[in-house]
Amino acid sequence: MGAYKPHRWVPVFLAAALFLTMGQPTAAQDVIPLFPIGGTNASSGICVIDIESGKTVAACQAEQFFVPASTQKLITAATLLMCHRPDWQLTTRVFYDGAVSKRGRLHGNLYIQGCGDPSLGSQYADTPPDRFIQEVAAAVKAAGITAISGGIVADDGAIPDNPVVSKWLWEDVGNYYAAGCYGINYADNRFAATFSTGEPDSRPTLLGITPEVEGLRFYYPYLSTNRSGRDSAYIYGGPYEYTRRVFGSLPAHREQFTIKGDLPDPPHFLASQLTDALRKAGIKVHDEATTARRLHESGLTLPDYETDGHLLFLHTSPTLAEMLRHTLTQSDNLYAEALLRQVELAVAPTATLAGSIEEMKTIWREAGFSIDDATLYDGSGLSPLNRITPLMMGQLLAHVARSGQGGDLLPELLPQPGEGTLKRFMAGSTLSPALHLKSGSMTGVQCYAGYYTGKRSYAVVVMVNHFSGTRASVQKEIADMLTRVLTTLDNRQ
């Protein structure tokens, strides 16, 4: 793993700092003065690769290791496109076992067989969030089932792993953007807590939690209000823990202010929601909802319902292209983590984080390109311990764009300036129509990676770590530098 090496830039070395391999050597002088980015203690790296030739045409600190933040989602997305067609979909199936009596009583259980689909019940899918539950309830009625002597079992065994990444920061775990990844993900694995706030330095009042989560306890004795108008509240709590604690502060004088956290057990939440929906529809369900994990912890095992039971309902996700488009445009960590697990699930019945990362590296080795030297702890880039070089990222992007295995679609799945997480970045630039970038940011980190499709097509990577000053100022420095580099390259054609 590469360590940070903050550098001081001395004029005599600038000629070697950033080079353009096209045209006259003096052309580099047009770009060099824009470095360093982010202050004297920052580490800055850039790599621009001509996709057709595979040659590096501009580089600076390109072989230094950086924290990529959310640009790491590009590795996950590119890997999925190497594995599956853009129209590939995930499938969640519902089975029942036992016999149905003449009076409509099912002497058995319903089983939701999960596959880790992040779009199930998601507010970002094109269907209503409760559509899955309503369709299963309709399928139960259509099968003539009026009562269930057992209950609803959520089979979350496809991902028998710690739902959250051990290398994530503790202050992130429990918040919506660090939601765990389960064998069954539902409703984006999140809830919303709404408060009202009064005078600064007073204690907010909890108005409610949506959706209601049975057993969830919310403690916030140290949550206060502030004058700044900023949301500085963090929710703490791990997977399967039904106690959530909130620290920090919320803006003062708000009738309603909402913060979001992650569900403690999404598979159980879905099974409970379906149980409630069936009961409201007049279908009696005897047992309370449970999951494969809970049964296993009680010393019980699931029957072979897939072989001995009956398929009741089949739900398909949006296409891979649609899910990746959302993942990259909105920088959705849950989608990225769930899709990473699909890499191993394509070759094995279950998936773990470590196994999925290793399978991802195997896929790239077999494709003739190695990412073995990268330090990867997740699929979303949320871990601050991830490390990759701009050169490695750029070569990967160029490789997948030339692969003909769906990689040529990747630029179309990326946001352009003015969209998603690029809403304000280079939005008014004349280069904007040709830029397709994924941003990545965390404390002291600002990165961009993707494609520029101007007179020629390039893979573009910029990484800045340990910057000082405001994020807006660093983003402007990056925008100015990219404008100079890409304009120079365009003018060479």
Language-model region placement:
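Bacterial N-terminal signal peptides
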Residues: 11-21
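Beta-lactamase-like hydrolase cores
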Residues: 26-65, 87-91, 134-144
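Conserved serine DD-peptidase/penicillin-binding transpeptidase domain
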Residues: 31-35, 82-371, 484-492
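Small-residue-rich helix-loop
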Residues: 57-59, 131, 337-493
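A short glycine/serine-rich beta->alpha loop
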Residues: 61-66, 260, 380-383
